[in-house]
Each structure stands twice: as C-alpha cells, then as structure tokens.
Amino acid sequence: MDIMEYNGTSLAYMGDAVMSLLVREMLLAQGWQKSKILQKKSESWVSAKAQAYFLIQLKERAFFSEEEYAIVLRGRNTHSASKAKNADVTTYRMSTGLEALFGWLYLTHQEDRLKALWEEIQKIGEYQ
C-alpha cells in the first residue's frame, strides 16, 4: 500500500511510537533512571496537551512545508473512535496531527526532516 493512501489515524499510530521513542531516548540520555520520574517527564512531551502546544509553536515559527502541513491537517481532521483521557477534542485532534507528521516522515524515510522536527520541538522545550 502506498503511504500516501494511509489515513491520518494510521500515520498518527506510527508517529506516536516514533515520538515516544525519541522522548525516551532523550530522557535516558539526560540521566533519568527512576521509572516514576521517566513516566512523569515523558508525559510533558507526549501528552495531547504537550503535542498540541508544540504544533501551535511550530506553526507560529513557519516550520512546516506545504506538504507537511497537509499531512498535519490530514491527521488533525481524521475522525477517531478513541479520545484523549485528559484533553478536549480540539487538543486531541491537534496532537493527532503532529503524530501523523512524525509517522509520515518516518514511513517516507525522511530522516533529516524528522530529526529537524524533533530538534525544533526540543528547542521549544518541555511542556509545563
């Protein structure tokens, strides 16, 4: 199946895993070792609220290409049966859009752009 035929939910499914892995690698590299602290710190990067915040910041910085933003919109506008535990529908959809972009960049082997996206999010910093 062509990756451009994947729906937003499928791209977000992969993107969730990619972003979670990047966050976990970063936290371990920073020296965090206690599971309770790792879990709490990771939430400030991968929660729906954090991801929506990152998406807004990236958009304000004009980070996305037209093609990338189309993927974000595809993820954001997808209708999912699931919903976030601690976020409203708008926040959840925005986070799904960012996850879709992570998934698409990974699946299309755009490693340099994926790295640039992650580095820009790290510059924005941990969501409080």
Predicted feature descriptions by range:
Residues 1-128:
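Double-stranded RNA-binding/processing signature
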